[in-house]
């Protein structure tokens, strides 16, 4: 994903282009003098910090942001796994919610690794998420294009939220959750109906909803990891390590929200207690390490 500033008629535009395949050989062709000058100007404009949400693109600010976010990621991960373990001890793993969600995710993993990947569907969702958050930030989308090889949108606003939102917002999972919630307001989705499979003799639409959410979350997770390892340029634009910390923290918070909503024995209060306990342990460990280091140096 690359971010490029394009100046037209004294109005600044931002292009988010998404590459799924190998770079085109045209990129290696030597450009004319005027084109080279324009390319240099674009690189200069790209280095400017723009937008109210945009993190200043200096090494100092990126380092400070990373130092703040890294322990937050560790603490949130510890709290999530502690709550997940507590829910498993409370027999959450026996519930239909857990099994159908995991079944959907496992079936998606089989599709992702064994069959042809629906790249076009992912790219469309990726660019649509950029567009959605552009509108949320009171911006405008001037161009939207999607192909199997990649896609791009051109907007008049750019910030950290717009640039990284596709990596931590599972668009299709959110759409499915909203649809099932809306239908559930008028129809009882918990009613079980006879099914032709012996392993699941009776199914409800709620169970199928959990299955679909599991597949949609697996879709988001696998494609997010698949694209990140391809070294996306917009991660570099915001600082790769800093961007990865933002993505990891946001996804952990979404997983924690999902666990709290699905597991009846876990509440926000429980998650908060686990989070504060993990933070105290991390702080105590860091303080002890600093005291030990000071004694060794002194």
PLM features: what roles do these ranges have?
Residues 1-26:
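N-terminal targeting leaders characterized by basic, low-complexity, disordered sequences
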Residues 122-135:
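Active-site recognition of the HExxH zinc-binding catalytic motif
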Residues 97-108:
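Canonical hydrophobic alpha-helical transmembrane segment
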Residues 140-145:
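M16/MPP (pitrilysin/insulinase) zinc-metallopeptidase core fold and M16-derived inactive scaffolds
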Residues 108-125, 152, 156-160:
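Short pre-active-site segment immediately N-terminal to the catalytic Zn-binding motif
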Residues 21, 28-94, 98, 146-293, ...:
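Metalloprotease/metallohydrolase-associated module, dominated by Zn2+-dependent proteases
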């Amino acid at each position: 994903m690359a971010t490029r500033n394009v100046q037209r008629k004294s109005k600044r535009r931002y292009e988010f282009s998404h590459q799924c395949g190998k770079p085109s050989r045209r990129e290696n062709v030597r450009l004319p003098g005027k084109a080279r000058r324009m390319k240099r100007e674009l690189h200069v404009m790209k280095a400017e910090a723009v937008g109210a949400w945009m993190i200043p693109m200096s090494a100092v600010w990126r380092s400070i942001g990373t130092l703040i976010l890294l322990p937050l990621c560790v603490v949130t991960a510890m709290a999530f796994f502690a709550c997940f373990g507590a829910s498993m001890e409370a027999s959450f793993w026996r519930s239909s919610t857990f099994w159908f969600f995991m079944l959907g995710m496992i079936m998606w993993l089989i599709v992702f690794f064994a069959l042809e990947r629906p790249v076009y569907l992912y790219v469309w969702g990726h660019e649509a998420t950029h567009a959605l958050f552009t509108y949320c930030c009171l911006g405008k989308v001037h161009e939207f294009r999607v192909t199997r090889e990649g896609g791009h949108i051109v907007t008049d606003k750019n910030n950290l939220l717009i640039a990284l939102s596709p990596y931590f917002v599972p668009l299709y999972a959110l759409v499915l959750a909203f649809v099932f919630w809306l239908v559930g307001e008028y129809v009882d989705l918990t009613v079980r109906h006879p099914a032709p499979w012996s392993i699941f003799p009776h199914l409800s639409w709620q169970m199928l909803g959990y299955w679909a959410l599991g597949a949609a979350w697996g879709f988001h997770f696998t494609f997010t990891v698949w694209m990140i390892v391809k070294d996306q340029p917009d991660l570099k634009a915001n600082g790769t390590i800093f961007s990865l910390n933002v993505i990891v923290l946001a996804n952990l918070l979404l997983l924690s929200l999902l666990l709290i909503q699905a597991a009846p024995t876990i509440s926000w209060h429980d998650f908060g207690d686990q989070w504060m306990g993990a933070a105290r342990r991390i702080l105590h460990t860091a303080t002890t390490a600093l005291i030990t280091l000071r004694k060794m140096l002194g």
